Amino acid sequence: MALIIAGERSGVGKTTTTLTLLAALKARQASVQSFKVGPDYIDPMFHRFVTGRDCRNLDPILTDEDYVQHCFQQHSQTADYTLVEGVMGLFDGLTGKTDTASTAHIARILNLPILLVLNCSSTARSIAAIAYGYQNFDSRLKIAGLVLNRVGSDRHLELLKDALEPLEIPILGVLRRQDEIQIPDRHLGLIPTSELPHLQSVIDRLAVLGQQCFDWNRLEPLLSNSDLNSTAFKSTTPSISLKSSVPIAIARDRAFNFYYADNFDLLRAAGAELIEWSPLQDRQLPAGVQGLYLGGGFPEVFAAELSDNLLARQAVQTAITQGIPCYAECGGLMYLRQHIIDFEQTQYPMVGAIAATAQMGSRLTLGYREATAQQASPLLQKGQVVWGHEFHRSSLREPIAQPLFQLQNFDGSLHYGEGYSQPNLHASYLHLHFGGKPWLIQNFLQACQQATALSR
């Protein structure tokens, strides 16, 4: 068994509840496997910080329902407990007409009971109407319990319990208003763990709260994996004939840290040797690499440091010029441009492999896209289709003459042309999950294997 943590809406305390439960279980010396519904990168960083295990994303759009089931079973089998953090409100999905890609959708795919987090601030009896609606909106779902968050006084809690009693939904946790457990955020959500030097003290506090604020006699059996069936699954790793392992340089530091753990696993399983390097601190690329992987992150926050590291910028430019295949997404795309202009309108030189400038702004570009390749790249042939996810506040100052992708929204409406390609370059705002299209790995590694290894 496992639990999925859902909220009545965004901002009610799903992440706080999840981290509190994870910290409390970890304090008991238990192994805990966590998952995150949807394409988010930052919440899984916090999960990993607490549990010491990679959090796995469950996304039926970037992958598919079979992959979601495979991923969940595969990684839950090696842990004592399993916990899934939902996304937005329980039923919030791609459209208002369906709950596709919502927390409810994942709960049905995996047949998981739901722990519903309610924001009880400034409400009393009305909380029962909210809980009743969620309890009865979809009869296929099981609300196993409630977490009452942001509870004020003891009198407030008594009113809430009296109101909820007729619904017969167990109250499995009560979290009081706590200013000292707030985690700071900025323009794309929570600030990543690598930038929070005092995070461990917050997690320690959450572990204590977790022991005190939850009904563990009823909660622990719901989280335990003792009855999880061991299942054999068909491998999702593509069959690739490689002469030897292919060394790939992975940009990974405070500026670049948006990666799916599954992508790394799938690359390694297919024959890649992943070598981490830092565009912030390292002066050269690792010797002998045959490919570059520049993930997303916050290059705009560290633009001055990235710009100051001239040797690293030159090394990346040289590698691409020499024909080393490069896969860059979102923050990696921004790094490859000529300049980044930050929120204060300060301009910083970047790699310059793409003749364009990244301009930060207030407008958030967000959502799933169906992307059809208009040009070939190291990952795709012209005409191939993938699903990806956009999440950024930067934009392009110059038009793209021959975009890599033509994008469509989930409803099929035309969006726009996006991305850059060369025979050895794939650079796009789209975040891709290789579990959805394993042939992306095959194309990339075969292109890398054909490249001459980088020499200094």
UniProtKB/Swiss-Prot annotation:
Q: What class of enzyme is it?
A: ligase
Single GO molecular-function term?
Answer: cobyrinic acid a,c-diamide synthase activity
- Which Pfam families does this entry report, sorted A to Z? CbiA, GATase_3
Gene symbol of the encoding locus: cbiA
Question: What name goes with this protein?
Answer: Cobyrinate a,c-diamide synthase
| Note, other | The a and c carboxylates of cobyrinate are activated for nucleophilic attack via formation of a phosphorylated intermediate by ATP. CbiA catalyzes first the amidation of the c-carboxylate, and then that of the a-carboxylate.
Ordered alphabetically, the record's keywords are:
ATP-binding, Cobalamin biosynthesis, Glutamine amidotransferase, Ligase, Magnesium, Nucleotide-binding
Q: Where is the GATase cobBQ-type domain?
A: 247-439
The keyword Zinc is annotated on this UniProt entry:
no
Q: Which reaction does it catalyse?
A: cob(II)yrinate + 2 L-glutamine + 2 ATP + 2 H2O = cob(II)yrinate a,c diamide + 2 L-glutamate + 2 ADP + 2 phosphate + 2 H(+)
* Organism, as annotated: Synechococcus sp. (strain ATCC 27144 / PCC 6301 / SAUG 1402/1)
Query: Location of site Increases nucleophilicity of active site Cys?
Result: 431
- To which pathway does this protein belong? Cofactor biosynthesis; adenosylcobalamin biosynthesis; cob(II)yrinate a,c-diamide from sirohydrochlorin (anaerobic route): step 10/10
- Family classification: Belongs to the CobB/CbiA family.
Which SUPFAM superfamilies does this UniProt record tie to the protein? Class I glutamine amidotransferase-like (SSF52317), P-loop containing nucleoside triphosphate hydrolases (SSF52540)
Cofactors that this protein relies on: Mg(2+)
Query: What role is this protein assigned?
Result: Catalyzes the ATP-dependent amidation of the two carboxylate groups at positions a and c of cobyrinate, using either L-glutamine or ammonia as the nitrogen source.
- Give the GO terms filed under biological process for this record: cobalamin biosynthetic process
